[in-house]
Design a protein with these regions (language model features):
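Short terminal alpha-helical segments
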Residues: 2-45
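Intrinsic-disorder/low-complexity, polar/charged segments
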Residues: 20-24, 75, 91, 111-112
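Generic alpha-helical secondary structure signal
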Residues: 22, 34-37, 57-60, 76, ...
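Amphipathic alpha-helical binding modules
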Residues: 79-116
């Protein structure tokens, strides 16, 4: 496997939404409707934890996680590449070093794109 630099691969399907739960939910609904239940569950858990701990850290983590997810999912070929790399690492049949490096690069590019 050759390490690849993450590239946009295609124009995004939708613009990058604001990093708010409402905007991220709308993006998840458009891009990956099957993930809406997980999004809602994560939001409920983050909100509950924020209230219980009187800390915004859980909500920040939620926005970061789903902001990166949306940034990647906006480009289906990039999302497919990430899934492939995760499968390579999960299979354990190859040295995962290059795949892990590319996964990190994809996530770093998505964080930058999302403004995180």
């Amino acid at each position: 496997m050759t390490a690849h630099r993450p590239e946009p691969l295609t124009e995004p399907l939708i613009p990058m939404p604001a990093l708010t739960p409402e905007a991220l939910r709308a993006a998840v609904e458009k891009l990956t409707p099957s993930r809406v239940p997980a999004f809602v569950q994560d939001l409920v858990e983050a909100t509950t934890s924020t209230q219980q701990n009187q800390s915004l850290a859980p909500l920040r983590t939620f926005v970061h996680t789903w902001g990166v997810f949306v940034a990647i999912q906006r480009r289906p070929p990039l999302a497919a590449r990430l899934r492939h790399l995760e499968e390579v690492v999960g299979a354990g049949t190859e040295d995962p070093t290059e795949a892990m490096a590319e996964i990190r690069a994809i996530h770093a590019a998505a964080e930058a794109e999302a403004g995180l």
